[in-house]
Amino acid sequence: MYQYNKISFSSLDGFEWDKGNVNKNRLKHNVDTSECEEVFFNNLRIIFEDTKHTNRLEKRYRVLGISTNGRKLALAITIRNNKIRVIMARDQSRKERALFESEFKDK
């Protein structure tokens, strides 16, 4: 089971996008930037540090959330220049979906 805290990113200045992370997520997983951003505007999300991929230069986080149209997404993110940078976005795995649904089963 994942260990996580409800981390707040409310003081950040939006998102950082470039050709690399925009096209990669759309081509590999059919997830566009607007869906990624929607996850952060929906209160049904879990954010936890990804200790496996964090290094001494940059913390990585995993986000399990839901888009406006109800798509359950898993994101890998980091913070650069006080902005959220999405590294990877895809549909939640079965294990991630079970964790997400158990957290929000009464909501």
Language model: regions and residue ranges:
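Ribonuclease/tRNase effector modules and their secretory precursors
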Residues: M1-K107
